[in-house]
Design a protein with these regions (language model features):
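C-terminal and inter-domain tail/linker signature
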Residues: 1-268
Length: 268
């Protein structure tokens, strides 16, 4: 487990010296371009029980996000609101131990599924962890969610990526049911199942729907993306370009890309 000094919002535990350098660069680009870091809410309650012993520091992930994102959404836009809500949800699921303290979701009604797989209620989703939820529809030889612990699932990907930022690409409908496309990316500098990365950029593209209540809390989330190819890239069985062939071959049309991803994602 990471101690409070090295509790990061990324996969790489950082020394104080490393964190100081990252923060210095982060502040520099914020001043230079007038950019703001993502807003992850609900992190300041002194009674929060943090999973790793302390409040996470997202400086590394935020730095990578600002430098490598493909979209800059205007302040107050629906895209930015959705982006920050999802980032808050990810933070709470990854770092707040008790599901009852997660304020980005409605604790009584929240449910989530990925690629047409099992629908998880709030408490169970928190117990098994985001990765087991989002990879649940994969065959067991790709990802065995039934026999992978919360800790094991997070270690697998945090050992592969120093940071893995996420961004909203486009939003196609407003509340209460928000439909959106997204991008998740990172440089494979670590190791996954004994396969060493070479620093290659690994990108995930997908789409999702999120239902929110009048408090802008998530009540239902459905996510679709090509999970199997992602794992095969980390195993060295495919190249990163293979994972994005459908998305990029459609000439940038999100609906054609989504249809191509959906045809692979849903079980037959």
């Amino acid at each position: 487990m990471q101690g409070p000094l090295s509790v990061t919002g990324s996969g790489k535990p950082l020394t104080k010296e490393e964190l100081d350098e990252i923060k210095e660069e982060l502040e520099e680009i914020k001043r230079k371009y007038g950019w703001k870091e993502p807003d992850r809410s609900f992190m300041d309650d002194p009674d929060i029980k943090w999973r790793f012993g302390g409040k996470p520091d997202y400086s590394l992930t935020n730095l990578k996000f600002l430098k490598e994102r493909s979209k800059i959404h205007p302040e107050g836009s629906l895209e930015l609101i959705v982006e920050n809500l999802v980032k808050t949800w990810e933070m709470e699921r990854s770092h707040k131990l008790e599901a009852s303290s997660h304020q980005s979701v409605d604790p009584d009604t929240f449910k989530i599924s990925a690629n047409g797989g099992k629908v998880f209620a709030n408490e169970e989703a928190n117990e098994v962890g985001n990765y087991n939820v989002l990879l649940n529809a994969c065959p067991a030889d790709i990802w065995d969610s039934e026999n992978t612990t919360w800790e094991g699932s997070h270690d697998a990907f945090h050992n592969a990526f120093a940071a893995f930022p996420w961004e909203v690409l486009d939003v196609y409908s407003g509340p209460p049911k928000v439909a959106f496309t997204w991008r998740h990316w990172g440089h494979f500098t670590g190791t996954y199942e004994e396969n060493d990365g070479k620093g290659e950029l690994v990108e995930l593209f997908g789409f999702g729907t999120a239902v929110v209540n009048d408090k802008l809390q998530l009540t239902e989330v459905e996510i679709f993306y090509n999970a199997e190819d992602f794992i095969k890239v980390l195993r060295g069985e495919k190249t990163p370009e293979d994972t994005n062939a459908n998305w990029k071959s459609t000439g940038g049309c999100p609906f054609q890309a989504a249809s191509a991803i959906l045809s692979k994602a849903l079980p037959v």
